[in-house]
Amino acid sequence: MTVMSLSRDLKDDFHSDTVLSILNEQRIRGILCDVTIIVEDTKFKAHSNVLAASSLYFKNIFWSHTICISSHVLELDDLKAEVFTEILNYIYSSTVVVKRQETVTDLAAAGKKLGISFLEDLTDRNFSNSPGPYVFCITEKGVVKEEKNEKRHEEPAITNGPRITNAFSIIETENSNNMFSPLDLRASFKKVSDSMRTASLCLERTDVCHEAEPVRTLAEHSYAVSSVAEAYRSQPVREHDGSSPGNTGKENCEALAAKPKTCRKPKTFSIPQDSDSATENIPPPPVSNLEVNQERSPQPAAVLTRSKSPNNEGDVHFSREDENQSSDVPGPPAAEVPPLVYNCSCCSKAFDSSTLLSAHMQLHKPTQEPLVCKYCNKQFTTLNRLDRHEQICMRSSHMPIPGGNQRFLENYPTIGQNGGSFTGPEPLLSENRIGEFSSTGSTLPDTDHMVKFVNGQMLYSCVVCKRSYVTLSSLRRHANVHSWRRTYPCHYCNKVFALAEYRTRHEIWHTGERRYQCIFCLETFMTYYILKNHQKSFHAIDHRLSISKKTANGGLKPSVYPYKLYRLLPMKCKRAPYKSYRNSSYENARENSQMNESAPGTYVVQNPHSSELPTLNFQDTVNTLTNSPAIPLETSACQDIPTSANVQNAEGTKWGEEALKMDLDNNFYSTEVSVSSTENAVSSDLRAGDVPVLSLSNSSENAASVISYSGSAPSVIVHSSQFSSVIMHSNAIAAMTSSNHRAFSDPAVSQSLKDDSKPEPDKVGRFASRPKSIKEKKKTTSHTRGEIPEESNYVADPGGSLSKTTNIAEETSKIETYIAKPALPGTSTNSNVAPLCQITVKIGNEAIVKRHILGSKLFYKRGRRPKYQMQEEPLPQGNDPEPSGDSPLGLCQSECMEMSEVFDDASDQDSTDKPWRPYYNYKPKKKSRQLKKMRKVNWRKEHGNRSPSHKCKYPAELDCAVGKAPQDKPFEEEETKEMPKLQCELCDGDKAVGAGNQGRPHRHLTSRPYACELCAKQFQSPSTLKMHMRCHTGEKPYQCKTCGRCFSVQGNLQKHERIHLGLKEFVCQYCNKAFTLNETLKIHERIHTGEKRYHCQFCFQRFLYLSTKRNHEQRHIREHNGKGYACFQCPKICKTAAALGMHQKKHLFKSPSQQEKIGDVCHENSNPLENQHFIGSEDNDQKDNIQTGVENVVL
């Protein structure tokens, strides 16, 4: 008997929709997607099995093994990104959204190509002329439903400040390690609403809440977004009125641009359904009602929460509908759960899942408002292009169009008001977002970075470009690249940069500086890339080795490049002052307003001139300061350095010698003033019966200009706002900084002082034209100390009486000299253009203007201290001859300086203004002193300690430099004198050589006690002899581990191993062909240069290669003798080359005396080729070549 078991099949009608919605969620988030499809410039993440099940084209591609998809990336060339977005939405949601008739044609063509039958049949349907969009979807019965919606009214745009424009995705989760962007912003933000995004991210997750920004916020950060403003306009938010619970429709809706907050609890999301459905009553969080002038957009009438409200501690991540929802609809019974039906509040459409409803709600959103320039009414597709265009367009004469984009003017209200250049807006936080955060009591959003832990180290990653940084401050500084913040303006043009190194790299093209120096040839270049190409072409340096030969800790392997291949020189050109970003009328208006706020009776010096450099004449600026009254100086006890910002601007175009005299008489100098410091007005109090007093204050912005060298008070490098700079030593201003009295100088006395201390124009030009040695500078300063006029020591007390004081700074000052900066090419003191690097050096009471152009010796020497202390003695200037700049002492001491003496501008000392490449200090190699000592010993033996014939040619310089030193010179003084040429005592070769052989190295400095027993050749060490014996014995101890080839010399083995490594480091500079050995490269370069160093011994023909030359010579021999090979050392002729080689070995074993006799015979009589018709072989060069060939055979 058979018993039949009763079975019942249970079918889940919503299973297919649920699976499809989950797959769509995975596609949107980029999780578990195994294929990336590239269409135009957009990347799409998808599942290969879903695509293969929906399209015959993808099925053939993925199932067939004939087409190999590299890295699971497939590129479609014949489709548009917008069309493929609609196709993916149809595959994952079974819905097609049609907005235009052209979209239907494109979808039909794409469906025919991809093998999607539903899309092919779209062309057979009839569409009305209504502009509203159509929706086609497949129901459960297989019937296609069609829906048309009315076009919504346009809503004004809402902007929240500047956008971060960078073509990188910022939605990637922490667990995903894929190289491609998991979210296609261009495809997703158009079709997926914000409610769907926030709901899908926290769907059925009660243990963790991921941080997810809405698509509206994410769309701001990508170039792929076709319209950023649509994301703002397309996110309506409802605000229900608590007093009227029934009105949950269109009247009480307001749009708020709010950002969801991070949380640690699951997020409750809203599911729209019919208004008759019962919902739970969820109290909303307190949100301030902000008035936003926007039109209201429809929302679903009622909601049903699928997850209970969390009662645990912690913040709750609410969606935007939940935050603003306040409905008092009674809840359903606890025992009965109604079926989930999702109805649209705008139409009678019903859906089975929230995903389908969210895709449907995209149809009810308003269309995109066109982006129009407010100046020229030109339309653009992206906001980024519009912003760039408006920056250019606003500088022209176009007036803003009344109907233009008011959004741009609301965020950037200062653009175009003052007529200045655009410096870039600051990142603004909109008022609605500030109110939201302030009302909820939370802090400002901090989502500009992510924190990762790698090997126990915390790294901060940028959310835009995924770069990692060790410190948060470095990440904040890097964030300026992605924002509109531009805080580093160029000193020469109107460009503003986000980072200081960008500005430094840009200013090189203005100054023409060559800061990158090659360590091989010491040649300098403007950029690192030019330097790299130079080293690749001329020095055969392959910079790719520094990438492939990295060690574990990030450095280079010592075997590849043990040193850095360049050094970055410091900046030598002084930066020009900032150009004013405001017009003169606006700046004067601000200064006048600050003048009215100051105390009455204030004397203010203004700048009526512009900040640009005018045309100057150095010779016509002598009588300016002498005709003007002296400006007294007021110092404060708490201020070390009194500065003046506007006095030099009031003097106008005068500079040069007047500024120097101002330093001499009043200890008055000026500083370089930035644009921000012009707002500070300089004021002073007026007292009855006194002249107007100018009070000068040292603000905190000028702290970077103070650089302490030595002494009690810091030395100050202050820079003029236009041209010259003044360097004052610390002790020279000690009396001025320690005094609390007001210094008043008589105009008559100051005028007489200027006439007495005025330097002659030719002397100033001579100082500026050539560098001065240290001896000359110290001689000048010692003379200056002896001739200080007494009138310069008169100062005035507050009562007005003059009193004579002693200058303490002159008695106790330590004289130092600072090296000036080199001028730009083409500038001089006699031209009409002021040199940018002119610096006044304050030494004692005399100012010396000096320009020192570096470049001849870039590795500076360090001067030695003399054994005897130099005693300075004042000498009369008239009797002291002017030392010549070509003297050996001057040339020797002019370059003896330390690198610490070369300083940059005060603006270069900014800690944020780092160079583009790191700075490395290279210590030059020390020269060997062995040869120098031997030459000194031999010279002393021959000539004694002092030779009467070698007298000092410049006695005045030596007396000034050494002072009252003892008669016997120290060892350092003798070292500077030029030593005579020594003659070799071992041979007579140097006595008989002519002028052409003076550069040849000498070979008899050391003895050679080790001689070879076979060839009698002498060597200096036994190791060299042992290596030489391998030529006779045939020993080859060095074997290649790769191919087994043996070598007698280890250097030949190392050259051979390069062949197996495949390293071709030597590149031809003409054809960029790479070679393994440097010798091979040199031989190859002869093809390009045409150098033929091998010439025939019998004729005047020259050859590139040695083998070609030997073959040519053998032809001469065969033509002369008819047959056989001739020996070059004797008249014997051999029949074969092997016999000639055996014969030549006999000459190797003869005694040296016999070889000399045979050599004399060969040179005089025994050469058969010379005795006959070969006239060309009689030259001395050809005989030397024959001897060279014999020596090569011997070796």
Swiss-Prot record:
Region of interest called Interaction with CBFA2T3, as start-end residue ranges on this chain: 300-523
Modified residues (Phosphoserine): 130, 309
Residues in cross-link Glycyl lysine isopeptide (Lys-Gly) (interchain with G-Cter in SUMO2): 43, 145, 148, 151, 259, 550, 557, 754, 758, 763, 804, 814, 821, 842, 850, 857, 923, 964, 969, 977, 981, 991, 1017, 1026, 1109, 1132, 1135, 1150, 1183
Zn-finger segments (C2H2-type): 342-364, 371-395, 460-482, 488-510, 516-539, 1010-1032, 1038-1060, 1066-1088, 1094-1116, 1125-1147
Keywords: Activator, Chromosome, DNA-binding, Isopeptide bond, Metal-binding, Nucleus, Phosphoprotein, Repeat, Repressor, Transcription, Transcription regulation, Ubl conjugation, Zinc, Zinc-finger
One GO MF term attached to the UniProt entry: methyl-CpG binding
GO cellular component: blood microparticle; chromosome; nucleoplasm; nucleus
Pfam families: BTB, zf-C2H2
KW Ubl conjugation (keyword) present: yes
Ribonucleoprotein found in the keyword field: no
Region of interest (Disordered), residue spans: 264-334, 745-804, 871-891, 903-922
Annotated function: Transcriptional regulator with bimodal DNA-binding specificity. Binds with a higher affinity to methylated CpG dinucleotides in the consensus sequence 5'-CGCG-3' but can also bind to E-box elements (5'-CACGTG-3'). Can also bind specifically to a single methyl-CpG pair. Represses transcription in a methyl-CpG-dependent manner. Plays an important role in regulating DNA replication and common fragile sites (CFS) stability in a RBBP6- and MCM10-dependent manner; represses expression of MCM10 which plays an important role in DNA-replication. Acts as a transcriptional activator.
The name this protein goes by in its record: Zinc finger and BTB domain-containing protein 38
Protein source organism: Homo sapiens (Human)
